[in-house]
Amino acid sequence: MLNIHDILGNDDENLLSYQCKHITKDKLTLPSHDFVDKVFGLSDRNNRVLRSLQTMFSHGRLANSGYLSILPVDQGIEHSAGASFAINPIYFDPENIVKLAIESGCSAVASTYGTLSLLSRKYAHKIPFMLKLNHNELLSYPTKYHQIFFTQVEAAYSMGAVAVGATVYFGSETSNEEIVAVSNAFAKARSLGLATVLWCYLRNPAFVANGVDYHTAADLTGQADHLGATLGADIVKQKLPTCQGGFKAINFGKTDERVYSELSSNHPIDLCRYQVLNSYCGKVGLINSGGPSGKNDFTEAARTAVINKRAGGMGLILGRKAFQRPLSEGIQLLNLVQDIYLDPNITIA
């Protein structure tokens, strides 16, 4: 078993001992073994949605912990198949995607219609399926950013999936139509008993100002999470925040100085906690993404997991860091992340 203290290195004390003083943990609904009963059992979700949610929370190495570890592989569309899989060509074969999720003990596997439909009869009863409904295909020229539907909610129901996922590019020129399309799709999904997960991403060239990329600012991503929760998502997926003050730097929208002085700080756990706060104080689970693969994947994945867990988040949805390496290493990396959520010594800040 890898040692978390060695992996975090110089960040060890800063991340593992920090205590949030702005938004304290008692103000949040935190992940727990009875989260579905405690939160969604009081909602308008029908019994089949509750069963679908509980199926994910009861599967894999994190079963009955209240946390989720999801393997997402839609990068063949979002980043092109060559760019995603050339480093590890076995994943051009979609069966290896599902095998990685199963062998690493993930809570669910999220992928495209082509991948999951091809394998559903063999695997839908062995690991929870999450069908990603829309994508930004990368073959248009010039490159544009517009989430379009590749399949329908009914396909998820037919293949035995327990959840659907979708993306909205909040802040983009097409965000309004994406919001309407996703709202309609999620309503249909709920009627069929499927859980809903929203990738709440920001996309606008104006969000890069004075050399700073505010696509990952806590105030902007927090508002995106809040919009996702408002759309009725059961879980929101968001990038880990890296900065603060997007509204002020870009000089748009509305904010309040207390967001920066009383509700957050520059500490990474406080920045992530502001995302949790916007996710209905944790009642809509926040899962953070793992980001691209690089030289320090184990350290970065561990760091993201510690920040998410200690902030009050619900888990990680980590793809490229896992599948852009040999299968055994991908399993080891995913298990490292899962071990952090299972470790009772890594507590809520």
From Swiss-Prot:
EC category name: lyase
Keyword Lyase assigned: yes
Organism this protein belongs to: Chlamydia pneumoniae
One cellular component term from this protein's GO annotations in UniProt: cytoplasm
Subcellular location: Cytoplasm
Keyword terms: Cytoplasm, Glycolysis, Lyase, Schiff base
List of catalytic residues: K237
Keyword Lyase: yes
Domain of life, per lineage: Bacteria
Family: Belongs to the DeoC/FbaB aldolase family. FbaB subfamily.
One GO BP annotation of this record: glycolytic process
Identification of the protein by name: Probable fructose-bisphosphate aldolase class 1
